[in-house]
Amino acid sequence: MEHKRNNILLAGLFFLLLGLVSIARAQIPQWEKCGAFVEPASEELLDPEPRGPVNVEADRVESEKNGVSVFSGEVKFRRRGQWLDADEVLYDKPNDTVEAFGDVRYQDATMDVISDSAKVNLEADIGEAENARYFLRDYHARGEAGAVEREGSVKTELRDATFTTCDIGDNAWQLKADRVSLDHKEGVGWARGARLRLWDTTVFYVPFLRFPIDNRRKSGFLVPSGGSSSNSGIGISTPYYWNIAPNMDATITPRYLSDRGPMMEGEVRYLNPSNFGRIRGSFLPHDAKRDDYRGAFSYRHSGSPRPRWFTNLDLNLVSDDRYFEDFGNSLSIASTTVLNNSLDIGYQGNGWNALGRFQGFQTIDRSIPAFARPYQRLPQFLVDGFFPDRFLGLDVDFHGEVVRFDRDAAPPTGGVRLDFWPTVSLPFRTPGTFFTPSIGVRDTRYFLEDAPPGTDSTLSRTLPIVSMDTGAIFERSLTLWGSDLRQTLEPRAYYLYVPFEDQSAFPVFDSAPLDFYFSRLFQPNRFTGADRLNDANQLTLAVTTRLLQSDTGAELLRASIGQIQFFRDRRVTMPGAAKETDSSSLVIAEVAARLAREWSLRGELRFDPHKKQTDLGAAELHYRGDEGGLLNINYRFRRNFLEQLNVSGRYPIADNWSVVGRWYQSIADGRLLELLGGVEYDSCCWAIRLVGRSYITNIEGDRNNSVLVQLELKGLGNLGQNVERLLERSVLGYGQPF
């Protein structure tokens, strides 16, 4: 009973907030589905400050005494920045006033007004019209008014007025107000005694309302949103958008969740010539479901304080390990286990760059033991350089690193690592071939802190790395499906030699086996980081073929396959792993194709020839139609780890109507990771989206189920939750222009 009473109170509060809202403009609406109200303004009309002589064209002219002239029959009254058309015009030259009658149309830089009659004081630049229709030039908006009072190009007063962004003849939504003030200088409108009408039915009364009349950002309350989920109950949010400056804004969102309590969220964004950033935070003083404080904070900043210098800051904090499960909005966010915190300061030279970094981590998943958590880099210094065509045509490559690792673990571990890796290569190139021999030396040294008794605290490893990379490009012309094409055949061979050195006593600060993809066939180390350098005596053989359009060079198909042949066992491994004895690697194949203008395909296969089985497979099929249709099919398979199918799409079923959905299934264990389905109607001035969603929030399989509804009144605001943003995350290609 108490829960039901809370829901009723929340509903009442939601509609009360609707009545107090001051609509802000944080995003520019799109009007591609709309027709034009009026023709584009001429150059003369775009002058915001009317001036200069008056020019009049008319069928007939009568001059009366006292300087009053009467023009009739298709009168065209022109002054730079102002046009007036009417059946009849009285021009009082001494007082510089104009009276117009019959099919009156007034135009200036900001609006068009059509009325039965009008009076204009040219000297004071003020005027009024009766029984008028008006159209805003800088915004797809129009309306009607019993009276219009114009004060230059700065302000317009409307009595008994309406306001809408819908096309002529369509009043899907409309504001009807006793009085409306349009401030063209600030780009806002003020309505008093306003009623929001949907399809000629008044849905609520607003005693005072501010709304945008152009595309500039405006401070004010955004339309409140409401929704319901099985995780947090019914909730309402009343975001306030603060346009602090042209380069800075903020959104402050008080939020109430019926099952948890009051919550505050906020975001600040800034953009300067030399830097940009975003600060986000949320705060729940007391979560009724957990009887505890909840909160999160993030700050991202990128800058260039001086030429060639750059900075990056990434700070992330969260109150507890379940925060993203309870308040995140996707499976990927809910499964976050570690948060990065880092500060980078770097310099970009001519062919080289340097970076200093401080990096730490917050481990959210407390089930991860201390010895398995990532090391902090306090600090790390990196220098990389590439200097082509130096002495005797040599290319010189250099990588250097000095880093101190630290981690809170028992017993404490850490230390300093120095890693230097210079390489020289001598490339030989012809129009259809290349051959590049290279030789490098990698020197790595450790100065360990709190080393266990009986172990060395100083370790080192110095090894040569020798490689030869060669390939060719063969090309032929052919005709397929009536199109002139070019096909290439690109064989490539890569030999790598690195002698063996026992590295089992070395710590593992940041090294791990590299995942095996096609590009890794040509890399000198099969491990990340510097803690392990592979021993190698191997030859990579690969071939790529492409289909290109003869006239444009556009790539229609690219297919590659490759494998490594090993001439000895690989004895350098990670701790606890056995040496590798296979005489060859897995076979790697990749394909990418543009099947038609709307269709594209990507695929990858990793085959184990020794076990005669597929180790990894992935395929992506994408369709993008001209009428808004989307289809994404993504299949992923990794033996003994995962097998997933992700299907999403958007299908137009009628004019402006579409269905949208996502089915994300774990085939390996039969779990439905996410199911989303909905319908949307999107027209010129309004849209509605209804979506049902269910997704897993944690490894235990707990689910969050929700129904989301969004009514978008374009140019005014959104009622309900931001369904559009959810669909952009869930359906690849949604929201992108066609």
Curated annotation (Swiss-Prot):
It is found in: Cell outer membrane. One of its GO terms (cellular component) is cell outer membrane. GO terms for biological process: Gram-negative-bacterium-type cell outer membrane assembly; lipopolysaccharide transport. Residues 1-26 form the signal peptide. InterPro entries: LipoPS_assembly_LptD, LptD, LptD_2, LptD_C, OstA-like_N. Keywords: Cell outer membrane, Membrane, Signal. It holds the Pfam family LptD_N. Together with LptE, is involved in the assembly of lipopolysaccharide (LPS) at the surface of the outer membrane. Component of the lipopolysaccharide transport and assembly complex. Interacts with LptE and LptA. Belongs to the LptD family. This is LPS-assembly protein LptD. The lineage of its organism: Bacteria, Pseudomonadati, Pseudomonadota, Gammaproteobacteria, Chromatiales.
